[in-house]
Regions:
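N-terminal regulatory/sensing modules of transcriptional regulators
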Residues: 1-26
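Cytosolic nucleotide-binding catalytic cores of signal-transduction proteins
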Residues: 19-20, 24-105
Length: 105
């Protein structure tokens, strides 16, 4: 997993970064639009993650993307329309699944 990382935030167009950080991901359509823009901005980061770590849920993929954008748990909950406890549960599952969790970010 060491070769996964994508671009750093400071190399991404500020307008695109703003758009990603202020997205709302409530529907599958919202997620697809967000994922497309995110992958374009971060060198197919999410696609690479999905290929290298099969079996990740959509919620886990969303968490990874939002965490990479340095979004807080509270804001992740608002963006995805779930409670903060749901976000914490996703993080907990990821920590169990991925021994190299911190290297993703």
């Amino acid at each position: 997993m060491n070769d996964i990382g994508g671009k750093k935030d400071n190399t991404i167009n500020p307008e695109t970064l703003h758009l990603l950080r202020n997205s709302t991901i409530l529907t599958d359509s919202d997620w697809e639009k967000f994922k497309t823009l995110f992958n374009l901005s971060y060198n197919n980061f999410l696609d690479e993650i999905a290929n290298k770590i099969p079996g990740l849920t959509q919620a886990e993929m969303r968490y990874i993307a939002l965490k990479k954008l340095r979004i807080s748990t509270r804001d992740m909950a608002k963006i995805t329309g779930v409670g903060e406890n749901a976000i914490r549960s996703v993080k907990s599952r990821l920590l169990k699944k991925l021994p190299d969790y911190d290297k993703l970010f």
